[in-house]
Amino acid sequence: KMKNTLQAVSNHKFSNILENIGNSDITHNINFNLFKKIVKGIGGLDTELTNQKKFLINIGIKKRAEIISAKQTFLKKADMYLRLQRLIDEKQMGSLFKVMLIKNKNNKFKLGF
C-alpha cells in the first residue's frame, strides 16, 4: 500500500513540501500497475514502461554526453560523468524513476523503450 506519495526534494534530501516553495522539486509516486489497468480499460491504447536508465540510454544520453564533453576541460568532463552516473546508475536514479508511454495501439512509436 502506497502512502505519503507526494514528496519534495531539496538539495538531494527529502524536505517539507510546504517549506522552501519554488526551490524544491516535487515528486509523486505513481502506481504504474493501476495506471496501466486504467489505460487498458479505455481501449484502443497501449502502454510501454521502463526505468529511467534504460530510457535515457535508449535515446542516446551517453552519446550526447560524449559530444558535449569533447571540447571541455577534464574537470567539466568529470562533473558531467558524475551527473550522468547519478541519472543512470541503478543504485541512484536509474531504477528509481520510471517512464511510461501511452499511445494508440496502431502507433508503432517506441523511441526510448
Language-model regions: role of each:
Residues K1-F113:
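Long, Lys/Arg- and hydrophobic-enriched amphipathic alpha-helices
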